[in-house]
């Protein structure tokens, strides 16, 4: 597995943090300076921690562990779904519904409902219903697909969760901590690294930055899955 280079990270803008006035002092070890009121992330640290996280997920994938990618902000949503699917993992990229992990039995029943409706759509049952009833069920199907589509193949709680934008996904973070699920988080300078088992300091607003980090983790998972 090829390591990410400093040049790649510079080109992707991984080093650009948030405005200095909004920083979290706990991120100080991962910041090397500031420019024009913006904190600059220490890419040497990013490379080291990304390598550690990649080794962790590679070994977990070798053991058949399950991964859940979470990222609901616009810049991350498409990346989260495409990279999770590429490495045969699960994802949430629209909105985190309270209890997705801590109330997993209820979520499982909603996923079953989604699968049942998809089967009814596939075999034409929905189209044969009265128009009003069909419309209601199709709207329900669209909503379930939007929020739970990335969890359809998740049979049990994930072994590892990968998060983009800790502050936005704090509800998911709290659920993972409560359940003892390891968290790998892409952390900008306004985040709290103590809430992640494997923090990766990086710009969580730029699409290229998010894509670079998440794709490297997906590469490692994919590689690990191929080693049986």
Swiss-Prot record:
Zinc in keyword set: no
Entry keywords, A to Z: Chloroplast, Plastid, Ribonucleoprotein, Ribosomal protein
Xref: InterPro entries: Ribosomal_uS2 (IPR001865), Ribosomal_uS2_bac/mit/plastid (IPR005706), Ribosomal_uS2_CS (IPR018130), Ribosomal_uS2_flav_dom_sf (IPR023591)
Main location: plastid
A molecular function (GO) term: structural constituent of ribosome
One Pfam family in the UniProt entry: Ribosomal_S2
Disulfide bonds: none
GO terms classed as biological process: translation
Localization, UniProt: Plastid, Chloroplast
A single cellular component GO annotation: mitochondrial small ribosomal subunit
Matches recorded under HAMAP family: Ribosomal_uS2_B (MF_00291_B)
Family under the similarity heading: Belongs to the universal ribosomal protein uS2 family.
Name the UniProt record assigns to this protein: Small ribosomal subunit protein uS2c
Native species: Chlorokybus atmophyticus
Lineage: Eukaryota, Viridiplantae, Streptophyta, Chlorokybophyceae, Chlorokybales
């Amino acid at each position: 597995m090829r390591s990410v280079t400093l040049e790649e990270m510079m080109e992707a803008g991984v080093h650009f943090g948030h405005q200095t006035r909004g920083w979290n002092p706990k991120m100080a070890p991962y910041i090397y300076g500031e420019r024009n009121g913006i904190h600059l992330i220490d890419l040497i640290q990013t490379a080291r921690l990304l390598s550690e996280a990649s080794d962790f997920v590679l070994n977990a994938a070798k053991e058949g562990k399950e991964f859940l990618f979470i990222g609901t902000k616009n810049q991350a949503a498409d990346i989260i779904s495409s990279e999770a699917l590429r490495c045969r993992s699960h994802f949430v990229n629209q909105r985190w519904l309270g209890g997705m992990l801590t109330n997993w039995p209820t979520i499982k029943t909603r996923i079953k409902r989604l699968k049942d409706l998809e089967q009814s759509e596939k075999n034409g049952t929905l189209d044969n219903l009265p128009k009003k009833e069909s419309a209601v069920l199709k709207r329900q199907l669209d909503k379930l697909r939007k929020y739970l589509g990335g969890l359809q193949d998740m049979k049990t709680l994930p072994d590892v969760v990968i998060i983009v934008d800790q502050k936005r996904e704090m509800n998911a973070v709290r659920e993972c901590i409560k359940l003892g699920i390891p968290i790998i988080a892409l952390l900008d300078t306004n985040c709290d690294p103590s809430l992640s088992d494997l923090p990766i300091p990086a710009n969580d607003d730029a699409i290229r930055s998010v894509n670079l980090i998440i794709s490297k983790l997906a590469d490692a998972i994919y590689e690990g899955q191929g080693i049986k």
